[in-house]
């Protein structure tokens, strides 16, 4: 059975693993998911990620980050643009998340990037999710 929203599945797996304080979580891999994991690592929300090859699509292993080994760094991770209701923003209307404490992840013509990078480049795109 195919999945309707693989990005929402990735975010839900990360959210659930954070709640039970798992050190790592395995997610079916895709290029978009790897790019989202790369942004999360650059912004310091996860420790690391690794793509493990198998005979199918591969597995994206995400190593979660905790403060003092008990509190997760990611407080909230929310999907914004969904398959049934896409959300697009231009560079002037990219939202500020939690007064600048969080980030928005956008899919732009230049690739997947944070809200700050998109504002600096002057481009908009699809608002994938917010993290803080």
From Swiss-Prot:
It comes from the Bacteria. It holds the Pfam family Ribosomal_S8. One of its GO terms (cellular component) is ribosome. One of the primary rRNA binding proteins, it binds directly to 16S rRNA central domain where it helps coordinate assembly of the platform of the 30S subunit. PANTHER family: 40S RIBOSOMAL PROTEIN S15A. GO terms for biological process: translation. It comes from Trichlorobacter lovleyi (strain ATCC BAA-1151 / DSM 17278 / SZ). Keywords: Ribonucleoprotein, Ribosomal protein, RNA-binding, rRNA-binding. InterPro entries: Ribosomal_uS8 (IPR000630), Ribosomal_uS8_CS (IPR047863), Ribosomal_uS8_sf (IPR035987). Belongs to the universal ribosomal protein uS8 family. This is Small ribosomal subunit protein uS8. Part of the 30S ribosomal subunit. Contacts proteins S5 and S12. The keyword RNA-binding applies. One of its GO terms (molecular function) is rRNA binding. PROSITE patterns: RIBOSOMAL_S8.
């Amino acid at each position: 059975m195919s999945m309707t929203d693989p990005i929402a599945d990735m975010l839900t797996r990360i959210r659930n693993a954070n709640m039970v304080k798992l050190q790592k979580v395995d997610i079916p891999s895709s290029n978009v998911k790897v790019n989202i994991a790369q942004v999360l690592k650059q912004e310091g929300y996860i420790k690391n990620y690794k793509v493990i090859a198998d005979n199918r699509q591969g597995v994206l292993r995400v190593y979660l980050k905790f403060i003092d080994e008990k509190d997760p760094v990611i407080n909230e991770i929310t999907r914004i643009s969904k398959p049934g209701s896409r959300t697009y923003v231009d560079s002037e209307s990219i939202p500020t998340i939690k007064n600048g404490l969080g980030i928005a992840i956008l899919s732009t013509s230049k690739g997947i990037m944070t809200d700050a990078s998109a504002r600096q480049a002057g481009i908009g795109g699809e608002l994938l999710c917010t993290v803080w």
